[in-house]
Amino acid sequence: MTGAEQLNSFLVDMFGRINKIEERTMAGGLGSAISITEIHIIEKIGAQGPVRMSEIAKSIGVTLATLTVACDKLVAKGLVRRVRSLEDRRVVNITLTAKGRAAYEYHKAFHERMIASVLDSLSPEQTAVLAQSLEKLQDFFRQEEAAMEGEEHG
């Protein structure tokens, strides 16, 4: 297997495992199933506070219709609530409930454990190389995403 094939195999496996483990970890912490999209919604709101529906949809790369369905599920699970803006009644913000805040903190702790487990075994030089490599991968994904958005609007 070439280096490129190994890297591809590693990335495909890693992305799949991260999603699967995140969903299972969160379900265990919440006591109910939760999708990766729902996790990302909670993460976005937890990091920023009350957020407009349209902003969340753009940030996590889903349509407003998809977000609405996911938010309906999160409301039913008691993790988020919809709040109309006092300044503009047309605007709906999504905010975390106390249970949603606990889910956000639980998810954040999972990520901290994941990163710590990697960094604990690397030298500062290896950490720098890993960060540079992941930054290049992130740049690729951003370029692909921008190209896709251009195709959708053009």
Map each language-model feature to its residues:
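N-terminal leader segment of winged-helix/HTH proteins
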Residues: 1-36
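C-terminal regulatory/oligomerization modules of transcriptional regulators
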Residues: 1-2, 6, 128-154
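Short helix-coil-helix linker/hinge
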Residues: 31-38, 97, 123
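Pre-recognition alpha-helix immediately N-terminal to the DNA-recognition helix
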Residues: 40-43, 102
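Short, locally clustered residues in the helix-turn-helix/winged-helix DNA-binding domain
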Residues: 43-47, 108, 135
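Short capping segments at the starts of secondary-structure elements
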Residues: 48-52
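Helix-turn-helix DNA-binding motif, specifically the short coil turn and the N-cap/start of the second
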Residues: 63-66
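Charged, amphipathic alpha-helical coiled-coil/dimerization segments
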Residues: 72-129
